[in-house]
Regions:
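Membrane-interface "cap" regions at the ends of multi-pass membrane proteins
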Residues: 1-17, 21-27, 40-44, 56, ...
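Membrane-helix boundary/coupling elements in multi-pass transport proteins
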Residues: 14, 55, 78-91, 194-207, ...
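Helix-loop-helix connectors at the membrane interface of multi-pass transporters/channels
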Residues: 60-64, 90-111, 143-146, 204-212, ...
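TM-loop-TM module centered on a large, flexible mid-protein loop between adjacent transmembrane helices
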Residues: 61-62, 68, 100, 217-283, ...
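C-terminal membrane-solvent junction of multi-pass transporters and transport-like membrane proteins
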Residues: 135-136, 303-314, 351-404
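Helix-loop-helix junctions that connect adjacent transmembrane segments
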Residues: 103-106, 138-270
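Extracellular loop-to-transmembrane helix junctions
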Residues: 15-110, 114, 221-230, 405-416
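Hydrophobic alpha-helical segments of multi-pass membrane transport proteins
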Residues: 121, 143-150, 291, 343-371, ...
Length: 428
């Protein structure tokens, strides 16, 4: 569970949040609260299905069982695609964070070295991965808690300077400087920030006692949203003016440096680099196994179903690594322009996964009238979530920086749908 928890703390929070702050100002807290509510509803839906039908790779399994084989095919491949694109984004982000110490180092170099390290780690046995990822996740969680505590201490005047209080929230255009439109536009980047939290539900589904582990894990999401997302972003907004944030640097590092805590900023940047490596490590691990499972189910080339003597899906791992490695070339030619496109694609793939959960749950309830861990506000919550998905897709079409990612995603889904239909007809 610590590994799944840690995977929800990464580039989205430490870097992606800067863009959402630029759109909404302090009112970005409303955006985080809205997306947090949607995520909670989705986690409860996933949790209800997982308690009744605990399976590994639950996203695709539930779509296949409660929507249909085409939906299961698309959801499974979409989740694999998400792991690859998130890996590419983390490799790109690594260069941004290492600019703190090595501003002249090309990002393609950091991406290449980081990828080689992660692949080498994943070629060891599963125990090495689990141990490494547990400690990386623990470091991330502890550092973020310390950051929040330090921030509120400065706000209350417990540091060397006078209390900052709430001037950075009320000044500089007020709490909602860009109006409702700013809050809405921020929803896209905030959706990206919440992407990793869904892995908590899938990890719980593989627990020894799902009927007790799943409700405990899902209900804890509320506190994680409040503490790590609202608490972390709230600390940033209290410590520094929102309009001083830059989209190409971490607001957490900028704020700590700005209030005179240079050593703390350096230490936090170390933790952020660890966080990026951790998420990349998890995506590499889970993506290879998703591709292996797709191959075992006859939905991917059989070669990817093969495993080594240690039980590792080596061919799938190396294939995923090769795809992630294309971002090294992209960073060589288009350094500084790749992050926004990858972020947009990931937001879209997240929405597909979330929609799969939501619609699966609607159909699941039609066949299962009594549930041990029933999701609240059914079916209203499902339709609220679907309306939210449509809203975010519309916003992606309105905002120029997300259009290319939206177009790429649309093409990907069309291709998957056609392949699935063609495969199904050939079997018939």
């Amino acid at each position: 569970m610590m590994i799944a928890f840690g995977s929800s703390i990464g580039t989205g929070l430490f870097l992606g949040s800067a863009g959402s702050i630029q759109y909404a100002g302090p009112a970005v807290l409303i955006s985080f609260a809205l997306v947090g509510a949607i995520v909670y509803f989705l986690m409860r839906m996933l949790g209800e299905m997982a308690v009744e039908h605990p399976v590994s790779g639950s996203f695709a399994a539930y779509s296949r069982a409660f929507i249909g084989p085409v939906a299961g095919f698309i959801t499974g491949w979409n989740w694999w695609f998400t792991t690859v694109v998130v890996g590419m984004l983390e490799l790109t982000a690594m260069g941004t964070f290492l600019d703190y110490w090595f501003p002249a180092l090309p990002h393609w170099v950091t991406a290449l070295v980081t990828l080689l390290l992660v692949v080498a780690l994943n070629l060891f046995n599963v125990r090495v991965f689990a141990t490494t990822e547990y400690w990386l996740s623990l470091i991330k969680v502890a550092a973020l808690v310390l950051m929040i505590v330090l921030g509120f201490a400065l706000v209350l005047g417990l540091g060397p300077d006078e209390a900052i209080r709430f001037s950075n929230i009320t000044d500089h255009g007020g709490f909602m400087p860009n109006g409702i439109s700013g809050v809405l536009f921020a929803l896209v980047a905030v959706t990206f920030t919440f992407g990793g939290i869904m892995s908590i539900g899938t990890a719980a589904g593989e627990a020894d006692n799902p009927k007790s582990a799943i409700p405990r894990a899902v209900n804890s999401v509320v506190w994680r949203i409040l503490v790590f997302y609202l608490g972390g972003i709230g600390t940033i907004l209290l410590l520094a003016p929102w309009n001083e944030q830059e989209s190409n640097e971490s607001p957490f590092i900028r704020v700590l440096s700005g209030v005179g805590f240079g050593p703390a900023a350096t230490a936090l940047n170390v933790v952020i680099v660890v966080a990026v490596f951790s998420v990349l490590n998890t995506m590499t691990y889970s993506g290879a196994r998703m591709l292996r499972d797709l191959a075992r189910n006859g939905q991917a080339p059989r070669a990817f179903a093969a495993t080594s003597a240690k039980g590792l899906p080596t061919k799938a791992l190396l294939f995923d690594a090769a795809l992630m490695g294309t971002v090294v070339i992209l960073n060589f030619f288009f350094e500084g322009k790749i992050f926004a496109v990858l972020l947009a694609i990931i937001v879209g793939t997240e929405l597909i996964t979330w929609a799969g959960i939501c619609i699966s749950h609607l159909n699941f309830r039609k066949t299962s009238k009594s549930a041990t861990f029933a999701a609240p506000l059914y079916p209203a919550a499902n339709w609220i979530c679907i309306a939210f998905f449509i809203l975010v897709l519309v916003l992606m079409g309105i905002l120029p920086e997300y259009r290319m990612g939206l177009a790429t995603l649309t093409g990907w889904i069309i291709v998957l749908g056609l392949i699935s239909l063609t495969t199904q007809r050939s079997r018939e």
